[in-house]
């Protein structure tokens, strides 16, 4: 990937932008392919892009993406417990506060990787749940609120090059998201859950908070896959309109 897919992956990776024009605005930095300290330039460009997530970018027709809205996420865990959770009307806040580091770019293979660190991410949604966790059978629905602290994740974008109307574009093929570490989690299921005729209510929130690392193992695989696919979708929208030479001039 052209090292300076910076602004582009700024528009694809952390950016997650839906672009309505084929030209990048002046406020987005670009890094020439053969420039010295290329990766530092890319890192600075990506960090700048992250700061645009909350307000969006009018010149690109980009709506605000922090908070990030997701219609639905389905958890079907059968590894250690049998637990099904459906999250609806998901609202994710905190991406714009992420710090970007460890950026690497491979020009020959069209790949980009970076590490993002967010001090906190707020996850809010409606939910319904059925199954078993820590020997407790639960069924219920309502609203939930999770606060994840000190989230560190690695993002890896892989693309191929295609020719479109005399321009070379990226066609993203894979966007891998891996949460490397999670410092803390505060988990609140606001409405009562039931075990038979017994109401768990806040007791279930206490149970998952006392065992939050265990509960995170239930959420993590699906969260990584779902958000990785979502980011890939945004990356495809960006790169099918913005030529590589616009984001990484020769």
Predicted segments, located by residue:
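A positional/structural detector of protein chain ends, strongest at the extreme C-terminus
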Residues: 1-4, 248-250
